[in-house]
Amino acid sequence: MGFDSVKVMENWQSKTSNENEKKKKKRRRKKNNNVRNSEHYEEEANGCWVKFRYIVCCASSTSDVETSLTLSTSTVGSQSAIVQSNDQPVGPVSSTTTTSNAESSLSTPIISEELNIYSHLKKFSFIDLKLATRNFRPESLLGEGGFGCVFKGWVEENGTAPVKPGTGLTVAVKTLNPDGLQGHKEWLAEINYLGNLLHPNLVKLVGYCIEDDQRLLVYEFMPRGSLENHLFRRSLPLPWSIRMKIALGAAKGLSFLHEEALKPVIYRDFKTSNILLDGEYNAKLSDFGLAKDAPDEGKTHVSTRVMGTYGYAAPEYVMTGHLTSKSDVYSFGVVLLEMLTGRRSMDKNRPNGEHNLVEWARPHLLDKRRFYRLLDPRLEGHFSVKGAQKVTQLAAQCLSRDSKIRPKMSEVVEVLKPLPHLKDMASASYYFQTMQAERLKAGSGSGSGRGFGSRNGQPVFRTLSSPHGQAGSSPYRHQIPSPKPKGATT
């Protein structure tokens, strides 16, 4: 073999060796890519676990959550600014409605600068809360809200570790739905307000969890759920004395926020679904995601985007965006009216002219001869006549169109204090017989029965529903019967 032939052979062997080496590298790269793809798939699968949970538990959250949308101040003054129905957020027609979550996601929050850590709050790990709620299983689901799903769980009384169901401390774990209508900003507000504000009529925040994109809040468990459930979902009505006890407790909670807290707070989202009840029907305010600091001394109001629930928001706040403590007083008046009548603040299932509770009730509030037409027919006379008169007068003051005329919440508390203990039941008086006769006469004359009818001689309470076919959402949906009115039988 000549020199040239040897050189060609060496070149061919070198080329073959290089090609083989390239093939080996290509195979190694392909193998590594497969490994990375497998790892990525596993990460996706793990990440989807939480998403799957939200899909299972919160599939209907878009339609029936009770949350708060924002109203652009450019639409203030427009009479058509609000067209939403009961328990639907205040929002504009002509401008773009954005969620508070959008506001929260505009920039990545710096947790260390925004989150105020309070020594009495417990920091839970996500895995502990996952185990405490039994893997967020559907049987532990208490309900849904704008923030996300709420689950029942059990943890150590003096720690954060999960314990066997029925032992330790019973808690309600609220999870942040990444696709929900409330976001990180509201999560922070909950911690920063409830972590600092301690009062018997505010729900107790036990702790929180923040890991990666997980945001959870842990509250004391409220066994009797929300006032909304008892007013609009139960087969048995709340007795009059219990209604007055709840009204007094809720008033004390607002009074504390407005007049007793070191830094006064405007609640901004007072409604029946945010009033939770413990085992003794003590009222506790929950959901501080929309709360705002009251105006500084020397200022009359806080200017802010309009946020809240339609039917509860004060008219001057909706029109101007000027927020004061008297805005909360108006909302309290709406809830007081709901407790008095057994009707929702907004209900399009009612006859024309009765959709808006406040507007329907105004003519009756200050008329001593007509106020009884407001009373929940399911009470069947088991209410205090003097108490009912006081409540209607108080509701009228709270619902005054002039915010300056509305009372302070401390004044509301003083009016309500004696009402749970009054014993002058209407059913035991001649007054009640006259009232019933007038009511039946008015009902037969109008054809609508003022929103109530009878079946087998007994009053029938109309079943209410939201525009989406449900009666509105609440963070608690327990099947706990309401107490019976005195003298009632099953």
Swiss-Prot record:
Active site per database record: D269
Database matches in Gene3D superfamilies: Phosphorylase Kinase, domain 1, Transferase(Phosphotransferase) domain 1
CDD domains attached to this UniProt entry: STKc_IRAK
Signal peptide: none
EC number: 2.7.11.1
Catalysis performed (reactions): L-seryl-[protein] + ATP = O-phospho-L-seryl-[protein] + ADP + H(+); L-threonyl-[protein] + ATP = O-phospho-L-threonyl-[protein] + ADP + H(+)
Top EC class of this enzyme: transferase
Coiled coil: 14-39
Key words, A-Z: ATP-binding, Cell membrane, Coiled coil, Kinase, Lipoprotein, Membrane, Nucleotide-binding, Phosphoprotein, Plant defense, Serine/threonine-protein kinase, Transferase
Membrane topology: Lipid-anchor
The keyword Iron is annotated on this UniProt entry: no
Residues with Phosphothreonine modification: T304, T309
Binding site for ATP: L142, G143, E144, G145, G146, F147, G148, C149, V150, K174
Pfam families, alphabetized: PK_Tyr_Ser-Thr
Positions where Phosphoserine occurs in the chain: S273, S303
Domain Protein kinase per the UniProt entry, residue ranges: 136-422
Residue positions, PTM Phosphotyrosine: Y219, Y317
Ranges of Low complexity composition bias in the record: 94-103
Function, as annotated: Involved in chitin-triggered immune signaling and is required for reactive oxygen species (ROS) production. Acts downstream of SD129 in defense signaling triggered by the pathogen-associated molecular pattern (PAMP) 3-OH-C10:0, a medium-chain 3-hydroxy fatty acid.
Family classification: Belongs to the protein kinase superfamily. Ser/Thr protein kinase family.
Name of the protein described by the UniProt record: Serine/threonine-protein kinase PBL35
Species the sequence originates in: Arabidopsis thaliana (Mouse-ear cress)
